[in-house]
């Protein structure tokens, strides 16, 4: 397996990404502002998205300034989990919609709890796959290169790490899609009378986007965030304690 240790490190782009993400989040906030005018999401949601993105962009800029030289992987790992904030806000549309529609409280709580249970289950299974793979020394050596002084993350191993688990909610599979979307369908079914009693257009859009967004939430939280937390935060800290060497990003 040929791997280039000198390809661009994500930290080198955090300054520009901080600005780009602010633009993307502004567009997301604009979409939620429009939805809020139709009463399908909370009126304050778009403001919260913008405020949270300002915080995320500030953290990214501080990280770029403070960690560009040390290049500590576990620090970059934490920041990298914040970087997908705009996409997480899109993926959580189903949650924001469920919180806003006037369905019975018991049904609302039950459906949201069921959805988060599915997310937690998927994340746990992916984490179990990663923990099992990390027990194999050759896997760890493939991901982290020992240059004698430090352990260096091989940037080109993203696809290799993804291949350590076959669990991907975005893969086509009728049974899995039906299973994942059943809780949402129950809540949306309970909202039928409300939907057809008002302007149907915004609700139809939110329902369609919610059904698409839930598998996206599963993928972001259950795959991406678990991967980042395990291979860029937990495992680097564990390796630093075990070897006495810093785990860093390549220059």
Whereabouts are the PLM-identified features?
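Hydrophobic alpha-helical membrane segments
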Residues: 82-91, 171-191
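Loop-to-transmembrane boundary segments
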Residues: 7-24, 152-185
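Cytosolic/matrix-facing juxtamembrane and C-terminal tails of multi-pass cellular membrane proteins
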Residues: 1-16, 150, 164, 220-251
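Alpha-helical membrane-embedded segments
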Residues: 55, 108-125, 178-189, 201-225
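N-terminal first transmembrane alpha-helix
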Residues: 1-114, 200-210
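Inner-leaflet juxtamembrane helices
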Residues: 67-72, 127-136, 223-237
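Charge-rich cytosolic interhelical loops and cytosolic tails of multi-pass membrane proteins
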Residues: 1-4, 107-174, 243-250
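Hydrophobic alpha-helical transmembrane segments in multi-pass integral membrane proteins
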Residues: 88-98, 151-160, 186-190
